[in-house]
C-alpha cells in the first residue's frame, strides 16, 4: 500500500499559480511520475511559442512532461492509466478532466482551488474575489468531480485581503497556502477524511477574464474601479483613453474628498495628485501608463502633460 513519499503522483497545472505546489511536492521527495500542462502558446510581439511555467520547472527537475490538447481521447486516457498514479494533483491546469480520467488514480483527483468554495467557482476565482470586495480570500482543497468545481471539499483555509493585493500577489499567497494544505492531506493517505459536500445554493461563478473587461466605466464608483485595477493587473489591465491614446491605470485609490467632479473629469489636486470623478467618490491615480510610454507616477505624468487638468477621460 502506498504511503507518504512513496505515492506516485501525476501533477497537472500550467500557470505561475501551479509552481509553488509542484515545488513543495518535489521538496518533500514525492514521486512525480508525470507532469501534464497545456501546450506551448504563441506569446509576445513575435508570437513565438512560449512554454507554460510548469513545463519549464518540470524540465529543470528532469520530470516527464505531457502536453495533450485534450484528455477526452481514449488513447490519451490509456496512456495516463499506464502511469498508474496513486493520486492526481490539479492546480490551475486549464483542461477539463472527463470521468474516465477522474476514475484512474487510486485516491482520486485533488484540486487546489483558490477560493472559498462554493463561492467563486470557475476559471478566475482570485480576480473574482478582488472584484467582489471580499475581506477574506481562501483556498479549497477538493476532490475533483465532473462538474465545474462542484466536488466535495476536504479543507479550506482563509487569508485576509490587504489593500495592496493584486491578482498575482494574492495568487502567490494562496498557492503557498494550498500547497501546505495539499501536503497535510497527502500525509493522511491511505486514511483520507470524508470530504464535505458543497452547498450548491451558495454557489457563485466567475468565468474567463476578457480584454474588454478592462475598459473603465466612469459611471461606476471609485471603489469599484479601484477593485478592477487590482483584479485585472497585469492583464488585461484597466484602461481609458486620453487624446485618442490608451491610458492604463496601474495603481489607484478610492477617495471621498467632495471635489464635485463629474464622472471621468480630471482634477490635478495639490499640484501633483490626480483625481478623476466617478459615480461616487474620486479615484486617485497613483501610477499610470500612456500608450507608447513607460509607466510613471501621477506627479511625473502631470509634469509632462500640462493639459491634463480638467479633461474628460474616455471621450
Curated annotation (Swiss-Prot):
Enzyme class: transferase
InterPro entries: Fmt, Formyl_trans_C, Formyl_transf_N, Formyl_transf_N_sf, Formyl_transferase-like_C_sf, Met-tRNA-FMT_C, Met-tRNA-FMT_N
Keywords, comma-separated and alphabetical: Protein biosynthesis, Transferase
Residues bound to (6S)-5,6,7,8-tetrahydrofolate: 115-118
Cross-referenced CDD domains: FMT_core_Met-tRNA-FMT_N, Met_tRNA_FMT_C
GO cellular component: cytosol
E.C. designation(s): 2.1.2.9
UniProt GO MF annotations: methionyl-tRNA formyltransferase activity
Source species, domain of life: Bacteria
Catalytic reaction(s) noted: L-methionyl-tRNA(fMet) + (6R)-10-formyltetrahydrofolate = N-formyl-L-methionyl-tRNA(fMet) + (6S)-5,6,7,8-tetrahydrofolate + H(+)
Gene3D superfamilies linked to this entry: 3.40.50.12230
Stated family: Belongs to the Fmt family.
Role description: Attaches a formyl group to the free amino group of methionyl-tRNA(fMet). The formyl group appears to play a dual role in the initiator identity of N-formylmethionyl-tRNA by promoting its recognition by IF2 and preventing the misappropriation of this tRNA by the elongation apparatus.
Full protein name: Methionyl-tRNA formyltransferase
Amino acid at each position: 500500500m502506498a504511503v507518504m513519499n512513496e505515492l506516485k503522483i501525476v501533477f497537472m497545472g500550467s500557470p505561475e499559480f501551479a509552481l509553488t505546489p509542484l515545488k513543495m511536492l518535489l521538496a518533500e521527495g514525492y514521486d512525480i511520475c508525470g507532469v501534464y500542462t497545456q501546450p506551448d502558446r504563441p506569446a509576445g510581439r513575435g508570437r513565438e511559442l512560449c512554454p507554460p511555467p510548469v513545463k519549464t520547472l518540470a524540465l529543470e527537475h528532469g520530470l516527464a512532461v505531457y502536453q495533450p490538447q485534450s484528455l477526452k481521447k481514449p488513447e490519451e486516457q490509456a496512456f495516463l492509466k499506464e502511469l498508474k498514479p496513486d493520486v492526481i494533483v490539479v492546480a490551475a491546469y486549464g483542461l477539463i478532466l472527463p470521468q474516465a480520467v477522474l476514475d484512474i488514480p487510486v485516491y482520486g483527483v485533488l484540486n487546489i482551488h483558490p477560493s472559498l468554495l462554493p463561492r467563486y467557482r470557475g476559471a478566475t476565482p482570485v480576480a473574482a474575489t478582488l472584484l467582489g470586495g471580499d475581506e477574506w480570500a481562501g483556498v479549497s482543497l477538493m476532490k475533483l468531480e465532473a462538474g465545474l468545481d462542484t466536488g466535495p471539499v476536504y479543507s479550506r483555509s482563509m487569508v485576509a485581503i490587504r489593500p495592496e493585493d493584486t491578482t498575482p500577489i494574492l495568487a502567490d499567497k494562496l498557492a503557498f497556502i494550498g500547497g501546505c494544505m495539499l501536503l497535510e492531506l497527502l500525509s493522511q493517505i491511505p486514511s483520507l477524511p470524508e470530504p464535505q459536500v458543497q452547498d450548491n445554493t451558495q454557489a457563485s461563478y466567475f468565468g474567463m477574464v476578457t480584454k474588454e473587461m478592462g475598459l473603465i466605466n466612469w459611471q461606476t464608483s471609485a471603489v469599484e474601479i479601484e477593485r478592477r485595477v487590482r483584479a485585472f493587473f497585469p492583464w488585461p489591465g484597466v484602461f481609458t483613453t486620453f487624446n485618442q491614446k490608451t491610458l492604463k491605470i496601474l495603481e489607484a485609490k478610492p477617495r471621498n474628498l467632495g471635489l464635485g467632479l463629474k464622472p471621468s473629469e480630471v482634477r490635478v489636486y495639490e499640484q501633483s495628485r490626480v483625481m478623476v470623478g466617478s459615480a461616487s467618490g474620486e479615484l486617485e491615480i497613483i501610477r499610470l501608463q500612456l500608450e507608447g510610454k513607460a509607466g510613471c507616477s501621477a506627479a511625473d505624468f502631470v509634469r509632462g502633460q500640462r493639459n491634463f487638468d480638467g479633461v474628460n477621460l474616455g471621450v
